[in-house]
């Protein structure tokens, strides 16, 4: 999703930090040129390339002496200075042990942007018109692995222990931050079943909004085709009620499964009979436009002559 990637990029850029001092510093992306600007009041921060300022309260060791009222006066003076300097936004990073500063910040117009285990981030739009700050992550990502043994035509399935209905499904779970899709599938399959596997392709993507399992946010559920590297089952009894190698046609026909599992089982049947190139979304790593970064691109197979004739992005 290009728009989600751009929002994450913009967010990280807004949080880009430089040195901390009595004067905040901004470093341009290309030349490394430093541009200085004063911080309001006694609160020190860093200017970003978009004209916003980030303030990390953990770096202000004298704040522990202030009560909520004194902090509010300090922050109010800083906001006035930032407006005078033409700043467009303020990002306030508050450690959990300084959460008593959240209420005074909120009274001055700050709103929650996101929270981490030991830190909350608040924002205040200082520019003209409605806020143009990017939102935080919009989706959680779950990945399952369809481990299919082509020699026996069997696929690895589990029944979750904590579900209301005992339906057969592919083992899987939530992706960790910075973890590739294929790596999530392989890891989750091993953690739940004890079976080792290798990523082959992406098979399907399901998007569901207002998902109860995602705290009411949107949920992306991806199913990967995996090739088994071991076959002995040693499943996690805390997570799984049952685990077995099931005949693929039986999984496609049974009523004791979810619609998405049944559909992917039929995809696997089609791929096994007609060729997996008919169903696979293969992965290729390509260089990003950002220096030193790479990304994974998933798509149907592209003949080499098209790559050669048209070039690559």
Curated annotation (Swiss-Prot):
Gene3D superfamilies per record: 3.40.630.30, 4.10.80.100, Nucleoside Triphosphate Pyrophosphohydrolase (3.90.79.10)
Keywords: Cytoplasm, Hydrolase, Mitochondrion, Nucleus
Compartments in which it is found: Nucleus; Mitochondrion; Cytoplasm
Annotated EC: 3.6.1.-
InterPro entries referenced in this protein's UniProt entry, alphabetically: Nudix_hydrolase, NUDIX_hydrolase-like_dom_sf, Nudix_hydrolase6-like, NUDIX_hydrolase_CS, NUDIX_hydrolase_dom, Pre-Nudix
Principal EC category: hydrolase
CDD domains found in the cross-reference section: NUDIX_ASFGF2_Nudt6 (cd04670)
Entry GO CC: cytoplasm; mitochondrion; nucleus
Residues spanned by motif Nudix box: 173-194
Keyword check for Nucleus: yes
Expression across tissues: Detected in liver and in brain (at protein level). Detected in liver, spleen, lung, brain, hypothalamus, cerebellum, pituitary, heart and skeletal muscle.
GO molecular function (one): ADP-ribose diphosphatase activity
Domain Nudix hydrolase, chain residue ranges per copy: 138-270
Pfam family, one: Nudix_hydro
Nucleus keyword on record: yes
Gene Ontology process terms (BP): negative regulation of cell cycle; negative regulation of cell population proliferation
Family, per entry: Belongs to the Nudix hydrolase family.
Assembly: Monomer and homodimer.
PANTHER family to which the protein is assigned, alphabetical: NUCLEOSIDE DIPHOSPHATE-LINKED MOIETY X MOTIF 6, NUDIX HYDROLASE RELATED
Note: This protein is coded from a FGF2 (BFGF) gene antisense transcript.
Reported function: May contribute to the regulation of cell proliferation.
Record-given protein name: Nucleoside diphosphate-linked moiety X motif 6
Species in which this protein is naturally found: Rattus norvegicus
